[in-house]
Amino acid sequence: HETSVQWLESYQAPGEVKIEAQATADNLAMLVEGNRVYNTDSESVARIAHVDIVETEAGETITARGQLTGQLLADRVVMATENVTNVEAGMYSLYSKNRRGLPLEIAASEGYTETTETEITWDAVLDGVTTLAEASGLGFKVLFNPETGVETYKVYRGIDRSDEDSPDYVGYFGQDVGNIQNITLTTGATNYKNVAVVAGAGEGADRAVRIVSLGNVSGEVRREMFG
């Protein structure tokens, strides 16, 4: 029953979601503040934080907005000063020492060796984790297991797809790579010119004129400009 789902994930931030749907009884029951929405493609889950119900001539619609559950880290404060050297360990430690009842489990360490000399003091855990991620190039996310209902906070190293010489390079947009959903192609020749009439100094018959064209064009397809 949804009319639009916008699911934005970020490498070094929780990410957000916006769902627009008809205000059916089922949608009104499901899209309420605090409920979770699961993305089967990325194994991530969002928590609904804000709901709008609008009545129009076409009927009632509901718009639900939320953040991916990594946003829960913003609800805890680092209750001391943390001096971080190993980034992965620090990103886990900031959460584990200040968890205080949050439901996110902690993934096993991958043994990443990125280091820093960073002091985190009395920030939100999310701010501290983001600082370490941006300083090191590591990212973080929360994965959801639909069989157990467990959400797991994980630090990970992303794949650089910007290097054209790398086999992981993905440098184009297309439906096959999932970064374009709808394609609109527009053609037209409103301002198109393919022949330039270039005049030099002088007056009348003494003025030098040259014609430059894109190919051998004539008739209606010949479009001249003066310059």
Task: Annotate each language-model stretch with its function.
Residues 27-38:
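Short coil-to-beta transition motif at edge beta-strands of beta-rich domains
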Residues 22, 51, 67-69, 156-158, ...:
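Structured loops at beta-to-helix junctions and adjacent beta-edge loops in soluble globular domains
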Residues 37-66, 141, 178:
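Short beta-strand and beta-hairpin "edge-sheet" elements
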